[in-house]
Structures are given as C-alpha cells and as structure tokens.
C-alpha cells in the first residue's frame, strides 16, 4: 500500500524531479567551468572582482554559514543555514591538507553545492506553481529556461552569499501561504521564520500576507 502511494507521488511529480536533477547537474557543470578559471565566487581576497563588490569575503571569513563569529544580524541566518552547512564545514576541515587540498577551495565548493541545491528547489517550486496555472507547455519551458540561465539566478547560485537563501525563503513562504489560504495553521508562521533571518525586505512579505489575510476575512 505504501509502495503504491510512493509510486503515485513519483509519477505525479516526475517532471519536477527531472527538472530538479537537470538544474543541479547543469549548475555543477557551470561551477566546474568557473572553478577552473577563477576563485572569485568564494574568495574575494584577489583583485579581479569584475562582477560587483559583495559581502562574500566578509561572510566567508566570519564563516556565518556554519559558525557565526559575530554577534550581529547574522545570528538567525547562521542558526538556520548551519543545520546544512556545518556538516560541510566539518567535512572540509577534515580533508583539508596544505599539500593537497586547500580548505578555502573545498569549503567554497561545498557551500556552492548547497546553494545549487537551494537554487534548484526554488526553480522547481516556481515551475510547479506556474504549471498549476495551466500555461502552455512551450511557454512554461521557456520561462523555466530563462530563470535557470538568467544572470541574477546564476550569480545568486554561484556566488557564496545569502542571496539564494533569501530567494528560496520568499518562494517557499509564498507557496505555503498560498496552500494554507483560508486555513488556520501554524505552518505559515513556521515558513516565515527564515524570512526574519536574511533580509529586512523579506520581513515585509510576512506582514503584507497578514494584512491581506485579515482583509479577506
């Protein structure tokens, strides 16, 4: 019985699973290409920052992704992301060897892999949401491809920063809020927690949702 339920779920979301795997593989290939040419996406100590000045160097040095070493705005963000990033940090620390494996390279690549998974989840959620609108298949594919290969998405995915987590928290909250519309559930409040840990602009979304829900009632 459980096997039948699992199989039905797989068949129902087979397009989403295929897209998720495709995005992960595509971004890994792009990452491999960039890693062979530059360290810019995880180390800004060099002088060839030709994209734009981000907080990557500061965030990487403070290690806010695994162990926040400052007592400021990064605390909640670190508490959430470290659930996934801390094991990566420990693994990279254990394999780092001055003669063979550079810690910054290993840890930078590990964090980018985590961001690739996060980005793929964001794209998959958007794809699933658009699909429910009954949009033409060609238009759906075109919009998805634009999102995958757009410069903002590529930059947020490859540059070790908080951007991609901010995007995912927004998309995840919107999806949950839409599913729970008109229902009494604490899921919306739970889904809102990451909003408070990344950027203040994300916090506005939670309050806007509260206002709209109140007016609709």
Q: How would you label these PLM feature ranges?
A:
Residues 113-133:
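Transmembrane-helix motifs of polytopic, lipid-linked glycan transferases
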Residues 185-214:
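Membrane-interface alpha helices of multi-pass inner-membrane proteins
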